[in-house]
Each structure stands twice: as C-alpha cells, then as structure tokens.
Amino acid sequence: MTLDPYYETMYILRPDIPEEEVESHVTKYRDMIVEAGAEVLDNQMRGKRRLAYPIAKHKEGIYVQLSHNGDGQQVEVLEKAMRISEDVIRYLTVKQEGPLPAPRVVPGTEAPEPAQAAETPEPEAS
C-alpha cells in the first residue's frame, strides 16, 4: 500500500448566497484544481452549519470539502482565488499523508460509462 500525499481544502461560503451561486463556486474551484494540473479526488457539500464563533458578522456558513492531489502548486492558485472572493469567509488546506481516499462520483460530472457490451445493440433477426 502506497502512502501518497494529498490535500484537503475546507472552505466556508457566506450563508446568504443562492444555491445556484454555491454550485458555481464549487465548479469554479474544482476546475481551478484541474487547470493547475492536479486531480480532484472528492468534493463534498457539507451544507449550512452554525459557526463556532461569528466570522465577518455571519453566524452560519455553507461548508464544502475538496480533496485533491498534485504537486502542491494548485494550492497556491486555489487559496489566492478564495482570498480574493467575497463569498468565501474562511478556508483551510491541509496536506494529508496516507492512502488516497476512495474516489466518488463528484456532483456535476459524468458517471463512469457502463460496460461497452451492455450498450451494443443486438443484431436483428431476418
């Protein structure tokens, strides 16, 4: 079993932004990771939760967790974009050591294609 390093980024979005905008932020940050040459391993929407203490006058936030691996250059690009964004009220990236998390189907992406044999039509009988 190989112990590869990977990164987990947890970020908190403002609670007052609409659902469509939340999805656009999730897609934007996921695409940034891919454009930086890294791979998105997992993307989990944790939902709206109460904060332990107020951040920027907000008592709640929308939590999103993003697991990715790469050479580490993607972290700088991602955190710079989050720092500039007014919709991200807090973020943290942690480098993890250990087995890579099992890949899941990321919302907004296509599921793996079924077996080719299942899609092949049967020849018609004459």
From Swiss-Prot:
Annotated Gene Ontology cellular component terms: cytoplasm; ribonucleoprotein complex; ribosome
Q: CDD domains in the record, alphabetically?
A: bS6_chloro_cyano
Q: Which Gene3D superfamilies match?
A: 3.30.70.60
Q: Which UniProt keywords apply?
A: Ribonucleoprotein, Ribosomal protein, RNA-binding, rRNA-binding
Q: Name one Pfam family in it.
A: Ribosomal_S6
List, as start-end ranges, the regions of compositional bias called Low complexity. 107-120
The answer, when asked if Glycoprotein is one of the entry's keywords, is: no
Q: Which GO terms describe its molecular function?
A: small ribosomal subunit rRNA binding; structural constituent of ribosome
Enumerate the InterPro entries for this protein: Ribosomal_bS6 (IPR000529), Ribosomal_bS6_CS (IPR020815), Ribosomal_bS6_sf (IPR035980), Ribosomal_S6_plastid/chlpt (IPR020814), Transl_elong_EF1B/ribsomal_bS6 (IPR014717)
- Positions of the UniProt region annotated as Disordered: 99-126
Q: Which GO terms describe its biological process?
A: translation
Q: Which PROSITE patterns match?
A: RIBOSOMAL_S6
Q: Which family does it belong to?
A: Belongs to the bacterial ribosomal protein bS6 family.
Q: State the protein's purpose.
A: Binds together with bS18 to 16S ribosomal RNA.
Give the NCBIfam families listed for this entry.
Answer: S6
Name it: Small ribosomal subunit protein bS6
